[in-house]
Amino acid sequence: MKCFIGGFMPIITTQDFTEEGRLQIGTFAPDIGQPAENVLVRISYSGDDEILEEMITDASGQTPVINLPAPPIEYSMELTETRPYSDYDIQVIMDGYRPMIIQGVQILPETTAFQDIRLQPENNNSVGERIVSISDHTLWGTFPPKTPEAEVKELPPSTGYVVLPNPVIPEFIIVHDGRPNDASAPNYWVPFAEYIKNVASCEIYANWPQSTITANVLAILSFTLNRVYTEWYRGQGFDFTITSSTAYDHAFSYGRNIFEEISTVVDDIFTSFITRPGIRQPLLTQYCDGKNVICPNWMTQWGSKTLGDQGYSAIDILKSFYGYDIYLMQAQRVQGVPVSFPGTPLQTGSTSEYVRIIQEQLNAISNKYPAINKVRVDGVFGPETRRAVETFQEIFRLSADGIVGFNTWYRISHIYVAVTRIAELS
């Protein structure tokens, strides 16, 4: 949420790319429930036809992780007039599907970027290349500042929509890709955690301290869940959850790459939000960059980075900006998953009905992701189950420890739902 006040912002040239970031591409047809194998992937500098890398996706729809040139890390540690990331174009080609180009994939030094691509079948209504252009990062580009709002909303009167007594994590966020009254802007249905990862990748740099990333993710979560809980836009007659306009909400760039350093944090805490004593709803935790826009009593992104550098924890960073009476809560219900996390990690030696559930789900997922071995469904967490969990974690970019904790449980649930939906459609 920022607005650059100033003149020309120079773009660093490729000769100055003295460091590296990493990139992995995942391809799906049409979504994560169906990986796309043998897709031709080409990478070039943005606006340049010269191909830097050419790869083929594996049975999980993924390319190897590759290193790509990036600017010096100093440019993302302090506000400068030089863009702190390099950008690339990705072209994907697969028989029977529309060729696709992702323009402006952002690579930060000392980070790993993930670019997932959803392919569309060729038909009479969709021909030619499909192009997705990623917006500038908000800390470097020009964006309107946030219009201030009250952090606690009056709940709307009953209009047919049910305001739940306690915050719930929705399965999807409906993002209006523009200002609220722009009827020409499309709406996108985005899985909740995927939406949070997209926003955070737009709003902060992934090579910042982990406590800074966590604090900013918590603010994004709380803001978003306030919009969900209060039915803010539906109460005004709109058919979406939130917008992509920084004047009203967060930045969101459809189809953009996310970063591993942000993704890991989101997977660990996506049910958490910020609140105050005596308040049931998540706070509308507004923020700005703190350099080009000043926002008293809100978190500043660059200020949170400074505190992270000084060793502050995520909650102490948040309290420094929003007040020392704030605290964290967790939503107890996640929509769209068959069974909630049991509360205790499952690992070698565990025996329970929850182990049986994970075994059944992993077997279903392995029908589409054959690198995952089949397991006996017996409720006993043995070596076969551990190996299947580790392979799942490797494919879906989680720490491959073979333990089904909070993040792995919900990731397995999410992929299981996607895979079974594809099977039903088939």
Q: Which ranges hold each PLM region?
A:
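Conserved, single-site charged/polar hotspot
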Residues: 3-10, 14-16, 38-42, 56, ...
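Short, ordered coil/turn segments that flank beta-strands lining enzyme active or ligand-binding pockets
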Residues: 31, 46-47, 59, 95
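A short, solvent-exposed beta-strand micro-motif common in secreted/extracellular proteins
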Residues: 73-96
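Structural motif
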Residues: 13-14, 18-37, 45-46
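Short coil/turn motifs at beta-sheet boundaries
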Residues: 18, 34, 83-85, 110
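Short loop/turn motifs at secondary-structure junctions and domain boundaries
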Residues: 46-49, 82
